[in-house]
Amino acid sequence: KQKLIRTMFKKVFFSSFFLIFFFSNLNANEVDLNDPYYKIGWKNLENPENTSIIIPDANASIEIIETEIYLDSKENIKKRLDLINEQETNIEDIYEKLIIFDREEYYKINIEYNDAGYITSDRFKNFTSSNLLETMNKRMSDSTSKVSWLIEPSLSENNLSTYAYKIEWLDGDITYEYKSLILGREGYIELTIFLFGDGNELEDFFDYYSGVIKEIASTVKFNETYSYSDYQQDDYVSVNTLTNL
């Protein structure tokens, strides 16, 4: 089912561009295993399968499909950054311990676990999306011009909050961020898709990435006794609430 849904999103989004890119992407699914890029610890690279993988340190898992590959350690993520940036990366600047790539690199998902404690969500229900956007704009750096919602934040009955926003920068750049927060008993898991744009993206573009982040986030499962509903009265409660994240 997961493979069908994710593949469907890809087909819808890219069908109109198929003829243009067909020849240049003819071998997109073929991987040169001798390429240094593919020797840094990628998993699900050979003999790919649909499976569930562990989210490091989170007492949780997430499902991947056979067209996805992943790195699940800061050390291997650092190797990738060193290669693509052609310079040394400080491992202390790397916060995620898991990244998932579509094999054709249509998307990359950073996955980070924060053991901040139990995150209360009561205040979130009293805030409007306008309130939250105002707070976000105040938090943004002086180099930003405007922040606007692509997906207004909401909280599901499964304690999952998905939202997305567009950032217009003073230098003319435009970026998009799609996020899902999955609340657990001792902290939360954050999924992020970060994209560059030019402001001329079509609706299919936004529908595609909205579908991807929501579908993948829905596969996250905390282990027994670690889910949000397993909270006990003497558990540590974070100083942050959902509205602060």
Predicted regions: what is each one?
Residues V12-F22:
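Sec-dependent N-terminal signal peptides
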Residues N131-P153:
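Acidic, glycine-rich loop-and-strand cores that form catalytic or ligand-binding grooves
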Residues V31-N47:
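N-terminal low-complexity, Pro/Thr/Ser-rich intrinsically disordered segments
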Residues L4-F14:
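Bacterial N-terminal signal peptides that target proteins for export
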Residues W42-N44, E49-L132, Q232-L245:
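Secretory pathway targeting signatures of secreted, lumenal, and periplasmic proteins
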Residues L26-E30:
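Boundary at the C-terminal end of the N-terminal hydrophobic targeting segment
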Residues D32, E105-N110, K146-N240:
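Short, well-structured beta-strand
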Residues T128, L132, M136, Y209-I216:
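Stable alpha-helical elements in mature extracytoplasmic
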